[in-house]
Amino acid sequence: VEEKLHRITNKYHDLFADRRHAFPQFVVEHINTVNRNLEISQYFFTDIVKEGIMLYNSGKCELAKPRKLSFREIRDIAQSEFDRLYPYACDFLGVVKEYFMPKEQYNLSAFMLHQTCEKLYYTILMVFTNYLPKTHKIKELSGMVKRFSQELTTVFPQNTDEEKECFDLLCRSYIEARYNKDFSISQEQLEYLIARIDILKDITERLCKEKIAEYDTMTESVIL
């Protein structure tokens, strides 16, 4: 199968080489893998079923329906996603503090701070909901997580023009810090954002660990 897929992929890449279109990307999974992930509502596979277009159906396979997960399964998924996503955020923030800021790479610092926030918000969403939305927008992500704790509403205050400007720069940095030559952010603004994101990091760790502990309690109560 892999050899056949490799030949098909090369053929499509040759066909698209002189075109302005993006190359088609192929993801091949066994039906058992697909159904196992559909059963536990894994977001990548459920989105494909909800939004994908069927091009061919042999009629030999049937897609599974998401089932109600046990508290143990919910807890295990939440722990796995926390262990996967939260360290990324910590590493991104560490790179900003230890490497980009000392070298005065301020635009790269802004971009990596955006990535840190994104991963922290993703961590919260996966632990609390087992779902990731298709957005990189910090404003949207911050709005989505606020329902889980009042603390999250205070991470980026909007009381002064300076606070509003810093948050706006953070939100814009995903694109503009890399591709807009006129994008500019100061050392002071970055230091302010780092301090706020440190707070978000601590809140994220505590909230997620508390939620996972809650799942543990629910699991134990069911067993009893």
Model-derived segments and spans:
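Terminal alpha-helical segments
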Residues: 2-224
